[in-house]
Amino acid sequence: MYSNDDYAEGGYEEYGYEMAADDGYDRSFYPMHEDVKKFLVYFCSVIKGGVVYEIQNLYENTFPKLSEQHFEKKAWPSEDEVAHLVDNDNLFMILYKELYYRHLHARIQGGPSLEQRLNSFYNYCNFFNYILPSKEPVQLELPDIWLWELIDEFVYQFQNFAQYRARLTDKSDEEMDMLLNNNSKVWNILCILNVLHSLVSMSKIKDQLEAAAAGRDPEEVAGEFGRHSFYKMLGYFSLVGLLRVHSLLGDYHQAIKVLEPIELHKKSQYSHIPACQISTSYYVGFAYMMMRRYSDAIRTFSSILLYIQRTKQLYSARSYQNDQINKQTDQMYHLLAICLVLHPQCIDESIQQVLREKNYHDNMYKMQCGDLDTFRNFFVFACPKFVSPVPPPSDAPLDDYVKEALEHQTNVFMDEVRQQQELPTIRSYLKLYTTLPLLKLASFMDHIPQDEIGEQKIENLLTHLLCFKHKMKNIVWTKGASGLEGKFQSGSELDFYIDKDMIHIADTKVSHRYGDFFIRKILKFEDLNRRLHNLKG
């Protein structure tokens, strides 16, 4: 669909607009709480002073706490109410409005109005117009968690607006006119890609990642902007944003390609934001699954799910990001279950235990028996919320077009499943034998006596056996920074060849390594024992 070359050299294009004078959320007036006033004034002062650790404390702790106390189901104070408190500080107001509109999207029932969606876009334009056209690095320091959530929210609001725009049945004539005639560039896909690629290019994050992988100092290639943590991290998070955008559009090859400088299966200095790491693995694993690279998908999902198991206490507190992490975790277990049905292989015992405890095995058995409804339900629950890159035509009938993109991707997936529908049954019979006549297997498959098997039945069986060979051979990543590279490997637990009318079968299943599992449990128990003794002491 789109390639890096389309955006890497073009430079950032500024977006102009005319912002509404007052976009405050429709609510009865109430006086601003004193603690909210103090927070806003102090927040502005620490951002001006560049005190990153204090900015992070206010952003991660104080702002959510005040939101819970005073703004659970209503908007934060409007721009007009806040501006005079902070002496109309332009940069702070841009950052405040980023949080303001994010809160509207997350907490207000029914979501923001069209005008608020437009003004949120204009506010992002203000922010990017402030940092991107600058001839020298701007004097702004923000914690990495805010930079990640800013890029993540930017892509989310694009996705949310694309779905809102595709739902024509609940719009007034005035809203339709605003959407079709006056705001064609608002939340436009080319604008989103332009911003993300510009951040990647300005930060030289790809050059830095390649230098680090080669054992060189990234500072040598970082350039004037990339040496600053602010630009470097925005560039890195924009790569993940591009992964998400291309996945939402169904361009899975490009989704993996944009991450080429990142060694997906290795930890790095950039993986310290859990939400970013988990989101990356979710979209990478999903893209691999849709590209029929099941081994890579299983490894990606298993690795991140093990990480989540070890750090799950971090995601217990209620927050938007933690809710998103918990949802993506559930989605990844569903996707892992699909991959294991289509491409059985050994996985970590602790992941297997979760699949058993949460009753995934019952549904996996249904999928192994060819239950297409279970496949579809798992996919629809676990897949991203796909969007169309363009709005419905201006002369389109008033209808709800939101599900068109989802239905298209679901049909693509289900076509692949139908091709493999007979394979679990074939596998179950082949596992019982070392040699098996074609005639006998055809009899098993069709549940009829061997003497009633005709030439057409044998031809159909040979087609299914060839399909088995083909589907069980995948490209698997082995080394290198490109997640698209790899070697063809057979992932089946058994292999076979056909000599005349006889199938010869070899079991290649690797036995479970229970020793490693028990060693880990023993070490964990000993560590727990030591801690208990220390508490007693």
UniProtKB/Swiss-Prot annotation:
Instruction: Report the locations given in the UniProt record.
Output: Cytoplasm
Q: List the disulfide bonds.
A: none
Q: Which InterPro entries match?
A: eIF3l, PCI_dom, TPR-like_helical_dom_sf
Question: What are the recorded GO MF terms, alphabetically?
Answer: translation initiation factor activity
* PCI domain location: 300-512
Report the superkingdom from the record: Eukaryota
Principal place where this protein is found?
cytoplasm
The record's Gene Ontology cellular component field reads: eukaryotic 43S preinitiation complex; eukaryotic 48S preinitiation complex; eukaryotic translation initiation factor 3 complex
Q: Which GO terms describe its biological process?
A: formation of cytoplasmic translation initiation complex
Keywords of the record, alphabetical order, are: Cytoplasm, Initiation factor, Protein biosynthesis
Which PROSITE patterns does UniProt cross-reference here? PCI
Q: Which family does it belong to?
A: Belongs to the eIF-3 subunit L family.
Quaternary arrangement and interactors, per the entry? Component of the eukaryotic translation initiation factor 3 (eIF-3) complex.
Q: What does this protein do?
A: Component of the eukaryotic translation initiation factor 3 (eIF-3) complex, which is involved in protein synthesis of a specialized repertoire of mRNAs and, together with other initiation factors, stimulates binding of mRNA and methionyl-tRNAi to the 40S ribosome. The eIF-3 complex specifically targets and initiates translation of a subset of mRNAs involved in cell proliferation.
**Which named protein is this?**
Eukaryotic translation initiation factor 3 subunit L
Q: Which organism is it from?
A: Culex quinquefasciatus
